[in-house]
Amino acid sequence: MAHKKGQGSTQNNRDSIGRRLGVKKFGGEFVRAGNIIIRQRGTATHAGNNVGMGKDHTIFALIDGFVKFERKDKDRKKVSVYPA
């Protein structure tokens, strides 16, 4: 017999809230300087022309313009902003 009470049901009933990661502005969309384009963990997408990267790897626009997703090389992506 068990020498402790069964407490699985109370211990298992938890879940962490979502982190709201992902693409916030899509290709061809107009952005203003400072707009967040992607929130990510790590550099799944790299910073291209006219975009900056925050310390949490958030990619944001440095100028007003249009978002363009490109390939950096065979297995890396980058995102750039080009003026209108």
UniProtKB/Swiss-Prot annotation:
The keyword Translocase does not apply. GO terms for cellular component: cytosolic large ribosomal subunit. GO terms for molecular function: structural constituent of ribosome. Gene3D superfamilies: 2.40.50.100. Keywords: Ribonucleoprotein, Ribosomal protein. It comes from the Bacteria. The keyword Ribosomal protein applies. Pfam families: Ribosomal_L27 (PF01016). HAMAP family: Ribosomal_bL27. Belongs to the bacterial ribosomal protein bL27 family. This is Large ribosomal subunit protein bL27. It comes from Campylobacter jejuni subsp. jejuni serotype O:2 (strain ATCC 700819 / NCTC 11168). The gene is rpmA.
